[in-house]
Amino acid sequence: MIPFSGLLFFYLLFLGLLPAVVLGLLGKKLHYYGIFLCAAMLVIVFWQNGQLAALALFFLWEMALCCLFRRLPKRTRPLLWAAVVLALGPLGLIKLGEVLQPFSLFRLMGASYMSFRAVQVLLDIYDGRLQKLRPVALGYFLLFFPAVSSGPIDRYRRFLSDLDHPPDREHYRTLLAQGIWKLAGGCVSAVVISGFIQQYWLAALPESGFGATLSYMYGYTFYLFFNFAGYSSMAIGTGYLLGIQMPENFNQPFLSVDMKDFWSRWHISLSTWLRDYLYSRFVMKSLKQKRFSNPRTASYLGYVLNMMAMGAWHGLQPQYLLYGVYHSALMCLNEVLDLHCKPFRSFKTHGAGQVVCVLVTFHLFSFGLLIFSGRLI
């Protein structure tokens, strides 16, 4: 069973959310029932997939790392990176196993999202932004079932704020209406539209030929957008019904005027996570230590590190790594043009130039997804 896919899941979700809606409309706290519902849904989904034991071990591992790191009397940088490596260790084994099939040790749906949540907690503890951990709230955050398989990647402090300030009856009515709308819209997007594209566009194309490949590029781009945005919308909508307001993951990405603008609109929770916890940390540390004679070098290398991490986050297969290389080059080129080409800055924000830049950005990203799909390899 896959979350937000299949009649059985939606039937169970409907039954599970009904008590939450009643509690919310009565102005009662939702997080205790939310924890119960998350545990029940995770047991059902992962038991059916044969991954329940792997999920339990993974969860205990990440919880132990976060709690033990918080208890350390002195948290040094080497200890931080050791904790981060250990937190990402299971994910690395899973990704390596996908390359070395059939020698995979284990598989776990949603490991990428759960790992990044745990790493974020470790980094926030080290930076002093988390003074204490509440184990039950941390466990709820790590295993919040609507976001387990497709995100968004929430932030612990924001999640905790929702738990500490539950919606009153009036606010919950608004969340209920928005949540139902997001669930319905996401279902149409992920199930109906993307399913139609897959069956009647992509599946009908021959496997070779320039025209077929070009058509596949466009079809795959729209398929992935409607599929991924739809799943994100359903996850966010379900969260609303449980009183958790997860961040938006898409904001009209195909209206972007350049690639930097695009990555502020597509898979927003992942791109901002990488920006805040990888790119910014690398650049600020490099500038502070004066690692490079040209300060811009730190920014360029930060983009390379950022986009390569994004590629590897999807998998270690060649197409994902090439996808990271491709977007590294695009982001660096974007930075150079922004810094040294005044006509470009003006061109992309006015009239016909803006339209041209939107079309170019769309095609640059679509070609990147063609690489990502593995069709060119």
Q: Model features per residue range: what roles?
A:
Residues M1-I377:
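Membrane-embedded transmembrane alpha-helical bundles that form the catalytic cores
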